[in-house]
Amino acid sequence: MYRIKDEWGEFLVRLARRAVEEYVRHKRVIEPPEDTPTELWEKMGVFVTLNRHNVPPQMALRGCIGFPLPIYPLVEATIKAAIYAAVDDPRFPPVQPEELDELTVEVSVLTPPELVEGPPEGRPKKIKVGRDGLLIEKGIYSGLLLPQVPVEWGWDEEEFLAQTCWKAGLPPDCWLDPDTKVYRFTAEIFEEEYPRGPVRRKPLV
């Protein structure tokens, strides 16, 4: 059962696109639209991903920022994440206006992270590539990878754990440390088929 209706997913992708374009072109932060569905004012975690169109998945990423925890109303979090993905992702220079025609927008709405219990060596059996995203925390370090990432890169569960450790700035075997907390979550993902094109629900498998 989906939490996010297809039309809500399309609304969020269009909103994220408008937030990016208005900020990149005019440095203007848009307000949530008056016709925002009531349900999208609920607090939820969300990530916005900007991808270069017609580029292999491993090379397409142009920016991805979001909020793992439900701390903002979804409509507000989507606007914030979209702008941050465009101009504040430390891995990339800010998006320029001339790039906007070549970027597709993807919105991932997250379930709250759930702690993976049990001995560390059993963690790969408790997650599933094609369903789960991962959040890893140890001390001051944390890293998150969305559910679509291991699918796009062809990873198995152990590699997914190792890559999330690396994303957190930790050794790739940190998931075997009992002091490392591993959380899993799922996401409903909506994407433009091409820049400013139709919006579809993205299948993971």
Curated annotation (Swiss-Prot):
Pfam families under this entry?
Answer: AMMECR1
**SUPFAM superfamilies hit by this protein:** AMMECR1-like (SSF143447)
Q: Which InterPro entries match?
A: AMMECR1, AMMECR1_dom_sf, AMMECR1_domain, AMMECR1_N, AmmeMemoSam_A, Uncharacterised_MJ0810
Signal sequence range: none
According to the UniProt record, which cysteines are disulfide-bonded?
none
Boundaries of each AMMECR1 domain copy? 7-201
- PROSITE patterns for the chain: AMMECR1
Listed NCBIfam families: AmmeMemoSam_A (TIGR04335), PRK00801.1 (NF002000), TIGR00296 family protein (TIGR00296)
Q: What is this protein called?
A: Protein TK0174
What organism does the UniProt record list as the source?
Thermococcus kodakarensis (strain ATCC BAA-918 / JCM 12380 / KOD1) (Pyrococcus kodakaraensis (strain KOD1))
